[in-house]
Design a protein with these regions (language model features):
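Bacterial N-terminal signal peptides that target proteins for export
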Residues: 1-9
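Residues that act as N-cap/strand-start positions at coil-to-secondary-structure junctions
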Residues: 2, 111, 130-132, 155, ...
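Bacterial N-terminal signal peptides
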Residues: 9-18
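Serine-esterase "nucleophile elbow" of acetyl-processing enzymes
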Residues: 11, 23-24
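Surface-exposed repetitive/solenoidal architectures
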Residues: 24-422
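C-terminal outer-membrane/trafficking sorting elements
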Residues: 423-487
């Protein structure tokens, strides 16, 4: 990996700040400064040097709840979302250790004063680490946000959430709207720091993600600094456009060591006017595991903004700056989307470049010109819609991860999402399941209860269940037990 001189990095303190000039700054310098700023923030926060954040500040009333796991803050209205955003940005409340749960879909149509939850909009040249991260758990409860629109060309590092640190964002869909900014822009999260988890989150086809410079992702713009993050059971259907390089269908860039992306898919067009574009992730700088993922969206690297060579890949876009010793693993993945690029871009349907990458049981749709590649196995596109291909993807798994769902992903295989984490159907020791009056009833002590449909959709607790088969997951006395229940 090439390193910029430390003196040069420190001299760029004003870069990427609202109102600063970036005319003479190269993309590499900008990337380096963003990473330096966030690393400085992490180090300062860990050392207790940052005093302008409060983990237990007085919280707004919201629509109920106490912010505990058992009794989370309830989010029902636009005002609840605005109150959360304001509490993080203006009241400096990180909500570390606090829990939120949406109770219904929320429409932001016509709402102009909602700002991304957790952001760095008030950073200054004197204090570039002055950012407001969200550090709690936000459960969308399988509800959707509609018509979320936020456009600011001078701001960076945002999506619906801006900057999150050690947070969990789960069970949330951003169905429609448009998010657009300068750099590090994501459909769900702008920047994920220090062990962030994004689980079962989705973007809709009526949602757009636009990034004027680098680090654009359908789910998260950049995973930067601190402990490894996890992106699990997420899909992107939102068209994504960037102009300066490093763009991925799910994630723009990863600089964390040990990040995992599992059971995720990109189905949207990913258009990069420069280079370094990937169907799943744009750029890798440290160790990462990508497992049971797919790209079926059109991925393009037009190389209009760069005179140097670039790269494009159906799974990973670029590994050229990966730190020596990084372990990059791709397992049970496939690429079936069109790859569009212009010379001198280096293309590979799985991952381009010479950095050592472990690729197991992964596939790509054969090229029309008959070109073959050493990374992955080529298969005819039409054969990817057959059960034989599903069986190939499931080789080496304890249970069937991949299935074909009618009307989903143009007939190509998809993971079973949440239920893929369920390996065994067994009986718990501290709690048991019964069917009473046609409804599922749990007897005994348990810590966590989750009910899923067989296609992996998590249902809100208390929902009226129709006749059919359900997966019930309990965590009791530290043991996870899973039941298949038929009503």
């Amino acid at each position: 990996m090439k390193h910029l001189n430390a003196t040069l990095l420190l001299s760029l303190a004003a870069i990427c700040l609202p109102g600063s000039s970036m005319a003479d700054v190269t993309p590499k310098q900008m990337q380096a400064q963003v990473e330096l700023t966030l690393q400085q923030y992490l180090q300062a926060h860990k050392a207790g040097a940052i005093k302008h954040l409060r983990q237990s500040a007085q919280a707004p009333a919201f629509s109920g709840g106490e912010g505990t796991q058992a009794n989370p803050y309830l989010v029902k209205t636009v005002d609840d979302l605005k109150a959360l955003s304001k509490a993080v940005e203006e009241d400096k409340n990180t909500f570390a250790g606090k829990f939120f749960r949406m109770e219904n879909d929320i429409n932001l149509q016509g709402v102009e004063d909602f700002r991304p939850i957790g952001n760095g909009f008030d950073r200054t040249a004197e204090d570039p680490t002055r950012i407001r991260p969200f550090m709690g758990t936000f459960d969308g409860n399988n509800h959707s946000i509609r018509n979320f629109t936020f456009h600011n060309d001078q701001y960076a590092m945002f999506g619906f959430f801006g900057i999150v640190k050690g947070a969990t964002i789960k069970n949330l869909t951003i169905a429609s709207g448009k998010v657009e900014g300068d750099h590090i822009i994501g459909g769900i999260v702008g920047v994920g720091m220090d062990g962030t988890k994004i689980i079962n989150c989705h973007t809709g086809k009526d949602y757009e993600v636009n990034c004027h410079r680098f680090y654009g992702g359908g789910i998260v713009g950049g995973l930067i600094g601190g402990a490894a993050s996890e992106i699990t059971d997420c899909t992107n259907d939102a068209p994504l456009t960037c102009y300066f390089g490093i763009t991925g269908g799910l994630v723009g860039s990863n600089t964390q060591d040990g990040t995992k992306i599992e059971r995720c898919g990109n189905r949207a067009a990913v258009k990069e006017h420069s280079t370094n574009t990937g169907g799943i992730i744009g750029q890798i700088k440290r160790s990462i595991t990508i497992r049971d993922c797919y790209n079926t969206g059109e991925v393009s690297a037009l190389n209009e903004q760069s005179a140097t060579d670039g790269t494009i890949g159906g799974i990973i876009g670029n590994t050229e700056e990966a730190v020596d010793g990084s372990i990059i693993e791709i397992t049970n993945c496939y690429q079936a989307g069109a790859l569009i690029y212009s010379s001198p871009t280096l293309m590979d349907p799985i991952v381009p470049g010479a950095f050592p990458t472990t690729i197991f049981n992964s596939y790509y749709a054969k090229m029309e010109d008959g070109s073959t590649f050493s990374n992955g196995i080529g298969i005819d596109y039409d054969d990817m819609k057959k059960q034989e291909f599903v069986n190939k993807l499931n080789e080496g798994e304890d249970s069937g991860i991949w299935i074909i769902k009618q009307g989903v992903n143009d007939g190509l295989p998809v993971p079973e999402n949440n239920t893929t984490g369920i390996r065994n159907i067994n009986q718990g020791e501290q709690a048991s399941i019964a069917i009473v009056n046609g409804q599922i009833q749990v007897n005994g002590r348990y810590n966590t209860l989750q009910v899923y449909t067989t296609d992996g959709r998590l249902l809100p607790l208390g929902a009226q269940l129709e006749k059919g088969t359900y997966i019930v997951r309990l965590v009791s006395a530290g043991k996870t037990s899973t039941y298949k229940v038929k009503l």
